[in-house]
Amino acid sequence: MSGAGVLAGLGTALPARLVTNEELSRHLDTDDEWIRSRTGIGQRYWSDGASTGDLAVEAGQRALKAAGTDTVDLVVLATTTPDHPCPATAPDVADRLGLSGVAAYDIAAVCSGFIYGLASAVAHITAGLVGSALVIGAETYSTILDPLDRTTSVIFGDGAGAVVLRSGSVDERGAFLGFDLGSDGALKDLIVIPGGGSRERAAAERPQPAGAYFTMQGKPVFRHAVTRMTSSAGALLDRTGWSPASVDRFVGHQANARILHAVADQLRIDGARTVIDLDRVGNTSAASIPLALSRACGEGLLSPGDRVLLSAFGGGLTWGSTALLWPDITAL
């Protein structure tokens, strides 16, 4: 093993259609106060035709430009909403980015997908298999939501975020300082799209599989999200030797503002250091962490050398955390 995976550039993309809480309240039994008080979400973006791959390409282009390069050796796409069940979306994204021929694959770890994608790409780099990678989290959850289910429709948004990683030294800014990953398949039904796979497949007599919509059991998911993100992020702090007080920015998966603040409280990280982005984009699943990082960059919340802790939780159940010293990079 040699070197480290180092963050070199960041890019994001959002679809054009802005969906406010007020718009949703016109056909759902809800209102702006109900949504904000329970989730912290004020609006989200939904695609009017752009696919997950389309958003991934746009974010990828911006990340490559931010990194000052037009090529990488590997493309990893984290998504729950691929363009097709088969084939994977990443090879098409790579081709459209002018990267045909490089290794490219999808990762399905739901809202933990971006952390899993980072871990996979960094492992390739440190093993000497590739010298650089593009990691993308992209989602179009609007395509899998039940429009009449207020427990999910008010939460999720569409978007994409991408980062370029390069080979470098573990002691330089931007190097990822280890990962903590985990899963619990016994709780797989807490977050699930029941239909469409080999257990409940489409057939000639029933072309639309039952249970085609995304479902989530909110209360237990909330509890497990807080527990698992706290444990995982805590393990990463132990590994890096950082104290909670030394963390400059905590960037968690943007599922719910109450979850993020609960995790920060349990970790004893100052709540003012927690980055919140879901108020403007909702829960964008695998795209949420890079989107939040981009916003933090744009608002001057991240400076070179800052200690940044990332943590996520998602269906599977899955969870993961990583950390880095923030580099001097461009976010587009």
UniProtKB/Swiss-Prot annotation:
Q: Where is it located?
A: Cytoplasm
Give the positions the UniProt entry annotates as the active site.
C111, H253, N283
Keyword Cytoplasm included in the entry's annotation: yes
Please provide the Gene Ontology terms (biological process) for this protein.
fatty acid biosynthetic process; secondary metabolite biosynthetic process
Enzyme kind, highest EC tier: transferase
So, what pathway does this thing act in? Lipid metabolism; fatty acid biosynthesis
Which intervals of the chain are annotated as region ACP-binding?
Answer: 254-258
Enumerate the Gene3D superfamilies for this protein.
3.40.47.10
Question: How is this protein named in the record?
Answer: Beta-ketoacyl-[acyl-carrier-protein] synthase III 5
Q: What is the lineage of its organism?
A: Bacteria, Bacillati, Actinomycetota, Actinomycetes, Kitasatosporales
- Reaction catalysed by this chain? malonyl-[ACP] + acetyl-CoA + H(+) = 3-oxobutanoyl-[ACP] + CO2 + CoA
- Record key words, sorted: Acyltransferase, Cytoplasm, Fatty acid biosynthesis, Fatty acid metabolism, Lipid biosynthesis, Lipid metabolism, Multifunctional enzyme, Plasmid, Transferase
Give me the segments passing through the membrane: none
